[in-house]
UniProtKB/Swiss-Prot annotation:
The gene is rnz. This is Ribonuclease Z. The keyword Cell cycle does not apply. It comes from the Bacteria. Belongs to the RNase Z family. Binds 2 Zn(2+) ions. It catalyses: Endonucleolytic cleavage of RNA, removing extra 3' nucleotides from tRNA precursor, generating 3' termini of tRNAs. A 3'-hydroxy group is left at the tRNA terminus and a 5'-phosphoryl group is left at the trailer molecule. Disulfide bonds: none annotated. Its EC number is 3.1.26.11. Homodimer. Zn(2+) 2 binds at D65, H66, D219, H278. Its cofactor is Zn(2+). It comes from Clostridium botulinum (strain Eklund 17B / Type B).
Length: 315
C-alpha cells in the first residue's frame, strides 16, 4: 500500500491559503519528497508523517518555489535523529544549487548524496529501515525514471514504479526439489549455492505481479515525449498552472500548461487517474475549471493542500 500527500498546490509564491507545490510519497513507512519550496516543512508537519524517514528528495528544477525550503528541511531531518544517508536527485546543476542553499548546515549527522540525472533511471531497495540505491534489478523494488522537459530552467519529470514481489509457490518449490531450508532466502531474491548446486529465485516464485506507477510532471509545456513517459500510470500528478483555455498564450510564454493540455497528456498516456496541481497564484478557485480537464480525460480532479491518496496493489 502506498500513501501520497499533495503538500502544496500553488506555484510561484506561497499564498495565505496554499503552500508551494510539493508532494510526499509514503511507501511502507519510507518517504519520497518531490520538490521543497518555502513552507514545505510546515505542510509536512501538518500531516504528521515525520521528517526522519524521508530517504529521497526529487527536485524538478532549480527555481526558488521548488527549492528554497531545502535548507530548513535538511536541518530538521538531522534534528529529528536521522543518521542514514539522504539522496537528493535533480537535473544537471542541482549539486551547485543544493550545496549553495545548504551552506547554513555545515554539520549534518547524515551523509547528503546529490545525484544529477539526465533522462536515466535509478533503482532502489526499500526495507523497513531505509531506502538505498541498488544495482541488482532482481532485488530492487523501486525504479525512479526521469525525463527532461521544456521549461525556462533545466527541469525533470519523474515516474516511480513500485515493484511487487512475486508470490511464493509451494507447488513450484516442491516440483523443483528445492530444499525447504532455502525457501525463505530464495523468496527474498537470493541466489544460493547449496550442496554443489545453484538455486535461483525463479525455482520457487510465480510470475511477476503488476506494480504501481506514479508519474509527476510539472513546469513544462506538453512535449511529445511525455505520453510515453507516463504510459499506464496508476496516478498521474500534473501541473495545471492555468485553468482557462483562454490562458493558452500565457501558458506558452511561461512554459506551463492549461488544464486541458494536462488532461490530453493523461489521455494519450492511457493513465488511470489525473490530479492537477501547481496552480497560478491568480487562480483562486481552480476547481471551477476542472470541467476543462474532464471534457478530455474524465477521471481528472483538482488537488488541494493536504490531499491524501492511497494506492493499493491489485491482485
Amino acid at each position: 500500500m502506498i500513501d501520497l500527500c499533495v503538500l502544496g498546490t500553488t506555484g510561484g509564491m506561497p499564498m495565505v491559503d496554499k503552500y508551494l507545490s510539493a508532494t510526499l510519497i509514503n511507501i511502507n513507512g519510507r518517504k519520497i519528497l518531490i520538490d521543497c519550496g518555502e513552507g514545505t516543512q510546515v505542510a509536512m508537519r501538518k500531516i504528521g508523517w515525520g521528517f526522519k524517514s524521508v530517504d529521497l528528495i526529487c527536485i524538478t528544477h532549480s527555481h526558488g518555489d521548488h527549492t528554497i525550503g531545502l535548507p530548513g528541511l535538511i536541518s530538521i531531518m538531522g534534528n529529528s535523529g536521522r543518521t542514514e544517508k539522504v539522496t537528493v536527485v535533480g537535473p544537471k546543476g542541482i549539486k551547485e544549487i543544493v550545496n549553495g542553499l545548504n551552506v547554513i548546515n555545515p554539520y549534518l549527522p547524515y551523509e547528503l548524496e546529490i545525484i544529477e540525472l539526465e533522462n536515466n533511471d535509478l533503482k532502489f531497495i526499500i526495507d523497513k529501515n531505509n531506502m538505498s540505491l541498488c544495482e541488482d534489478n532482481n532485488k530492487c523494488n523501486l525504479i525512479l525514471s526521469s525525463l527532461e522537459v521544456e521549461h525556462s530552467a533545466k527541469c525533470l519529470s519523474y515516474s516511480f514504479y513500485i515493484k511487487r514481489r512475486p508470490r511464493f509457490s509451494v507447488e513450484k518449490a516442491s516440483k523443483n526439489n528445492v530444499p525447504k531450508p532455502l525457501w525463505s532466502k530464495l523468496q527474498n531474491q537470493e541466489i544460493i549455492n547449496y550442496d554443489n548446486k545453484i538455486y535461483t529465485p525463479d525455482l520457487v516464485l510465480d510470475n511477476a505481479r503488476k506494480g504501481i506507477k506514479i508519474s509527476y510532471v510539472t513546469d513544462t509545456r506538453p512535449i511529445s515525449a511525455i505520453p510515453e513517459f507516463i504510459k499506464y500510470s496508476d496516478l498521474f500528478i500534473c501541473e495545471g498552472t492555468y485553468g482557462s483555455d483562454e490562458d493558452i498564450d500565457k501558458a506558452i510564454k511561461n512554459k506551463h500548461m492549461t488544464f486541458r493540455e494536462s488532461a490530453t497528456l493523461a489521455l494519450n498516456g492511457e493513465c488511470k487517474e489525473l490530479i492537477l496541481t501547481h496552480f497560478s497564484p491568480a487562480l483562486s478557485e481552480p476547481e471551477s475549471f476542472v470541467d476543462n480537464a474532464k471534457q478530455v480525460f474524465h477521471n481528472s480532479s483538482v488537488a488541494y493542500d493536504g490531499l491524501i491518496k492511497t494506492l493499493k496493489f491489485i491482485d
